[in-house]
């Protein structure tokens, strides 16, 4: 199935719509860069990136697989949605919602599993909520 673009109206999106898209793309780009960096770091240093004791009882022998998950789910996915949004693809509207909800879910699981730093986790949960809310506004506007 081919991706569809937003219909051309001649004047482009209204200023409010452009600001909304810029906000979504900026937040998703921030999340993507940090997910790619964090995931790459965990994969490159699977036994030293974080204390191994945090993996006790999880079934993980190292931080490699959590790093892969972080890289793909928190790094690649938001990046793909941000690129889709900049290209005007309609799929980005659903993507924003998935990224926002996914980031909130990721942080909730992370907070239950391994609390490293509350301020950072609260910040990323807030970013996830912001992406979700802005994504809902974008979807209703479209």
Give residue spans per PLM region.
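Topology signature of small-to-medium multi-pass alpha-helical membrane proteins
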Residues: 2-142
